[in-house]
């Protein structure tokens, strides 16, 4: 009976999160699920404490990074960067396509996939419309912004909430994670550029007139804060690198930097700090705790052991098969039931599997790659994608779920394969 309850509660929670009836917040949906598993006795008080211990650092780090990115957006930092990329293309369509993806990859690395997709996309959309592109020409650039935000959100622990949760679960330190995922991220970037170019090659204009694009300096709304932002970024990077050596949770460092930046931004006329703070994804904290408790319910009734047995079987076929198998399992599960519950279920199953340590390491990182890229197959793969599609509708661009799936599955599978190949080469060479 307990097993049935755990499964039913999981699917009820998942349905509420994806469907969001009457705008029901994802945090509330996850808490409803959490309360149900607590009331029914599927999880206990010890589980609650364990879950909070796992997710608090991850979620607070994520919120801090998004806060910093929102202030940077307010002062025109990302628009300034995007204009530079367009100007650098010198009127060459393919160059602009590639440069925008490189910019998206950089933003995703340092400010998470959500920041890259939700901040960069409206900026790029406004610029290419200003260039006089019709809807057929707009589509490749919009898809590229959304895709690259996830496909290159691998290199740093903070680049994706999925990364943070998995790294915290397995106790992976910042530098250790970077050393393993830097090369796979490069493979993903190169594969993304090649696959997206091949798919959209007939829709990318050969040339365009850049005379209508304003100068980069015109995008800067607060020169003082713009200059300070470079110091903030330097401190952020240093903080990432030294956090594990000084044994301070990375959320303390990112949180402190975010608070300092907010206090400095309060003196600016262009940054509305109250709106920035309100716009941060605080519901992610509640969502993560609630969703994790629901997943722990599945673990407690032995459901994750089924997946663990499957992974143990895959592990017997060697490192390459283990990485590919885990990566594609994670990707398709993410596409079907969202990447957050997927990465949690997979992480627990990997931990419970009988794979040897070297194989298990490959599976841990392959799970992250699959959960980062898998959401590009379907709109429900990640909460960020659903929000991204909603933002596009508000901007007058409607992408149907059918169009998204038809495009997403063709683009994602080859990129996923080459990214996992990059991980395999990293682990056998280094």
Swiss-Prot record:
Where does it localize? Cell membrane
**Membrane-spanning ranges:** 4-24, 26-46, 51-71, 100-120, 138-158, 181-201, 223-243, 245-265, 276-296, 317-337, 373-393, 409-429
Q: Which GO terms describe its molecular function?
A: arsenite transmembrane transporter activity
What UniProt keywords are attached to this protein's entry? Arsenical resistance, Cell membrane, Membrane, Transmembrane, Transmembrane helix, Transport
Tell me a GO cellular component: plasma membrane
Q: How does it sit in the membrane?
A: Multi-pass membrane protein
Supply one GO BP term.
response to arsenic-containing substance
Top-rank taxon: Bacteria
Q: Which Pfam families match?
A: ArsB
Q: Which PANTHER family match?
A: TRANSPORTER ARSB-RELATED
What does the similarity note say?
Belongs to the ArsB family.
Cited function: Involved in arsenical resistance. Thought to form the channel of an arsenite pump.
The protein's name in its UniProt record: Arsenical pump membrane protein
- What organism does the UniProt record list as the source? Staphylococcus epidermidis (strain ATCC 35984 / DSM 28319 / BCRC 17069 / CCUG 31568 / BM 3577 / RP62A)
Show the taxonomic lineage.
Bacteria, Bacillati, Bacillota, Bacilli, Bacillales
Question: What gene is this protein a product of?
Answer: arsB
């Amino acid at each position: 009976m307990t097993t049935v309850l755990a499964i039913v509660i999981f699917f009820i929670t998942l349905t509420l999160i994806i469907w969001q009836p009457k705008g029901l917040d994802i945090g509330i949906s996850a808490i409803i699920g959490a309360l149900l598993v607590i009331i029914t006795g599927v999880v206990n008080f010890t589980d609650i404490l364990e879950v909070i211990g796992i997710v608090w650092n991850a979620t607070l780090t994520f919120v801090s990074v998004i806060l910093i990115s929102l202030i940077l957006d307010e002062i025109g930092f990302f628009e300034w960067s995007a204009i530079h990329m367009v100007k650098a293309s010198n009127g060459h369509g393919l160059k602009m396509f590639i440069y925008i993806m490189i910019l998206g990859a950089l933003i995703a690395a340092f400010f998470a996939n959500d920041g890259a997709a939700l901040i960069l996309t409206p900026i790029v959309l406004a610029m290419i419309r200003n260039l006089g592109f019709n809807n057929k020409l707009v589509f490749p650039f919009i898809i590229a912004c959304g895709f690259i935000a996830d496909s290159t959100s691998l290199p740093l622990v903070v680049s994706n909430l999925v990364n943070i949760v998995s790294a915290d679960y397995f106790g992976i330190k910042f530098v250790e994670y970077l050393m393993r995922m830097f090369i796979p991220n490069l493979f993903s970037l190169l594969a993304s550029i090649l696959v997206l170019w091949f798919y959209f090659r007939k829709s990318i204009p050969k040339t365009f007139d850049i005379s209508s694009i304003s100068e980069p300096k015109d995008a800067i709304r607060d020169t003082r804060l713009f200059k300070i932002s470079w110091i903030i970024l330097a401190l952020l990077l240093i903080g990432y690198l030294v956090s594990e050596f000084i044994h301070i949770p990375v959320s303390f460092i990112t949180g402190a930097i975010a608070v300092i930046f907010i206090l400095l931004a309060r003196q600016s006329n262009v940054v509305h700090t109250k709106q920035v703070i309100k716009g941060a994804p605080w519901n992610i904290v509640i969502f993560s705790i609630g969703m994790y408790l629901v997943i722990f319910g599945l673990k407690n009734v032995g459901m994750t052991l089924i997946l663990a047995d499957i992974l143990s079987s895959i592990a017997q076929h060697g490192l390459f098969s283990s990485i590919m198998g885990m990566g594609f399992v994670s990707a398709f599960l993410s596409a079907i039931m969202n990447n957050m519950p997927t990465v949690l279920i997979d992480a627990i199953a990997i931990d419970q599997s009988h794979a040897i340590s070297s194989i298990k390491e490959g599976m841990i990182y392959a799970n992250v790659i699959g959960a980062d890229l898998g959401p590009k197959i379907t709109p429900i793969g990640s909460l960020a994608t659903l929000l991204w599609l909603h933002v596009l509708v508000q901007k007058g661009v409607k992408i149907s779920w059918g169009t998204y799936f038809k495009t997403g599955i063709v683009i994602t599978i080859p990129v996923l394969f080459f990214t996992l190949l990059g991980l395999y080469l990293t682990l056998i060479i280094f």
